[in-house]
Amino acid sequence: MAEITAALVRELREATGAGMMDCKKALTEAAGDMEAAIDWLRTKGLSQAAKKSGRTTAEGLVGVASAKNRAAMVEVNAETDFVGRNEAFQAFVEQVAHVALEVGDDLDAIKAGKVPSGRTVADELTHLIATIGENMAIRRAKVLSVESGVVASYVHSALRPGIGKIGVLAALEAPSESDALLTLGRQIGMHVAATRPAALDVASVDPEALERERAVLIEQARESGKPEAIIEKMVEGRIRKFYEEVVLLEQVWVLDGESRVAKVVEKAGAKLVGFERFQLGEGIEKEESDFAAEVAAAAGTK
């Protein structure tokens, strides 16, 4: 049996990210064999990962990957903001985005894809859960592509290239790709990050959302006591204002505060055919922690 030295424990810890005492125990169980110790930790980690799978994951990162006329965006969640600053987690998000770029935005296909370690994305995720000690989940993915033109990506306040908490893809069709078109795409990404449009054009506005808005506007207009014919005109004017707020092509361009997005794109000789905006954790209800209950549980009391 090899001697369990501090250097050996440190080497195992650096290789796996596991705790010092766990590494020492693993080496003892494996009689000092490094590979066997790693396997022991992985087995232990798999058990831990299963226990953590029920925890809420509302933190994490958004990642993008681009290849000229195609781009992918993913959201990978974790339990705490601390994990988002972990380099191994950031690297994993990058890898998942690149897998999505290759295989598309079906989550099962992404999880079956391979990462540089040789593992599948699903296995790499399980390994990361065991190593870092938090539940994690690949929440969603989106891939946009065009036959001719560009799909630009933008990450707001990126922690590193292509990684942050808000990401946007913008698909522009044009006769050819150009640096100017890519720049416009990134500017559209910046605009979308700031304005949060709900639809690309008027035709793609959610009919139910539109009807709810119209019903509210009608009731508001009727309070004025004006005739129905005038109320109808008032409502139509306010619906146009609603479109300017939620429809990307109808919005005022944030870079000059005057032009419509549609005119900016038209002037560039392009057509904006799609966009996607991911904001980390949107729609996820975070769990409220009961600190007193946690302390009581840890102490074995109720």
Curated annotation (Swiss-Prot):
Ranges for region Involved in Mg(2+) ion dislocation from EF-Tu: 80-83
Transmembrane intervals: none
Taxonomic superkingdom: Bacteria
GO CC list: cytoplasm
Pfam families listed in its UniProt record: EF_TS
CDD domains membership: UBA_EF-Ts
Keyword Cytoplasm included in the entry's annotation: yes
Record GO terms (molecular function): translation elongation factor activity
Keywords noted in UniProt: Cytoplasm, Elongation factor, Protein biosynthesis
Subcellular location: Cytoplasm
Main subcellular localisation: cytoplasm
Assigned protein family: Belongs to the EF-Ts family.
PANTHER family per UniProt: ELONGATION FACTOR TS, ELONGATION FACTOR TS, MITOCHONDRIAL
Biological role stated in the UniProt entry: Associates with the EF-Tu.GDP complex and induces the exchange of GDP to GTP. It remains bound to the aminoacyl-tRNA.EF-Tu.GTP complex up to the GTP hydrolysis stage on the ribosome.
NCBIfam families: tsf
The protein's name: Elongation factor Ts
Source species of the chain: Gluconobacter oxydans (strain 621H) (Gluconobacter suboxydans)
Protein encoded by which gene: tsf
